[in-house]
Amino acid sequence: MIFVDTNVIIDVSTDDSAWADWSQEQLDSAVRREPLAINEIVYAELSVGCRFPDEVDALLTRFGIVIDPTPRRALFLAGKAFQRYRRAGGTRTGVLADFFIGAHAVIADSVLITRDGGRYRTYFPGIELITPSVN
């Protein structure tokens, strides 16, 4: 299973001028190798740009993405990684979701497609990422 970060789905669904092509190429390549998945956190983040759950579901169907429920071990790992981040001076807002996403990919022993590799590499050493070469 290959996990997909929120930004990759948003890039393609909004036809982002800077990232849509890269993100679409990664999704196309990945889906030929393994099933694509997100967790509940990514679903919640995607809902911000939609009016109804059916719209989020349609996005997932469009890209062939399934929802993989977050295991408790991943929730625990996310909390511990976020704790390290805060102790290192990280802000309280806007990043906790990334820790849930990264921890889930680690516990599932999965690859994560994202444009934001830095934080994942720092707090989840050894995580396998597909990122743009600029990261």
Ranges and model annotations:
Residues 1, 102-135:
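Acidic, PIN/NYN-like endoribonuclease modules and their adjacent C-terminal/linker elements
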Residues 1-38, 47-59, 130, 135:
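Short, well-structured N-terminal submotif of metal-dependent ribonuclease cores
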Residues 33, 62-64, 109, 126:
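A generic structural signal for alpha->beta connector loops
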